[in-house]
A protein has these predicted regions:
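Iron-sulfur cluster-binding electron-transfer modules in prokaryotic oxidoreductases
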Residues: 1-200
């Protein structure tokens, strides 16, 4: 773990312990580039590790997949998603924290599917609730949990698939679908899962 959950929960000491341990190992192996499938790790490695001595080129897997497709190193056959409606949820630590919006959409564009944007997307995207460590704690009093609100926005697009690129978001949105009793009809898939399906 990069230490992100500890830091977001307010435990700076534990974060630094985890970060320094990771940096020591990564530097021992002279690591220059890291590809991560988690926007939380992406943000932490890219923006917080440098001040602790961890300087790496950090790439999110949607950026890497987009690059591989563009360079012709990964072929997407399409067809698997022909006629499917996909909506994309922007993870906070990928989008608003690091301005990565186009790479995941470029990947979805290569599928034979239709991308339907939610009313709150890109810079105005709504958090699924996991970014504030909500998935690790009990519900708080209020009108509605944020992951339910975000799931409702996704369902407004009448999707077959809700795509994202964050394991935390995928969990929160899957839970939201179960809450709305839509988990049998609508699936939550990571961008990498979509590409894996389309390249078989």
């Amino acid at each position: 773990c990069t230490g992100d959950p500890a830091k977001r929960a307010g435990n700076e000491f534990l974060f630094q312990m985890q970060a320094f341990s990771n940096i020591e190992i990564l530097n021992q192996y002279n690591i220059k580039k890291i590809v991560t499938a988690c926007p939380h790790c992406f943000n932490t490695l890219k923006n917080e590790y440098p001040e602790l001595g961890g300087n790496y080129e950090v790439v999110h897997h949607t950026q890497f997949i987009s690059y591989l497709i563009k360079e012709g190193k990964l072929t997407v056959s399409g067809g698997s998603f022909n006629g499917k409606r996909i909506t994309y949820h922007d993870p906070c630590y990928l989008g608003r924290a690091n301005n990565v919006y186009e790479a995941p959409r470029n990947v979805i564009e290569k599928l034979d599917a239709e991308l339907y944007e939610m009313k709150n997307c890109k810079e105005k995207g709504l958090c699924c609730g996991a970014g504030g460590a909500q998935m690790f704690k009990e519900s708080e009093p209020g009108n509605k949990e944020v992951n339910i609100k975000r799931t409702e926005q996704a369902l407004e697009t009448s999707p077959n698939i809700i795509a994202s690129s964050c394991p935390f978001c995928n969990t929160m949105l899957s839970d939201g679908l179960k809450n709305k009793e839509k988990h049998e009809k609508v699936k939550v898939w990571d961008i990498a899962e979509l590409i894996n399906q389309a390249s078989q």
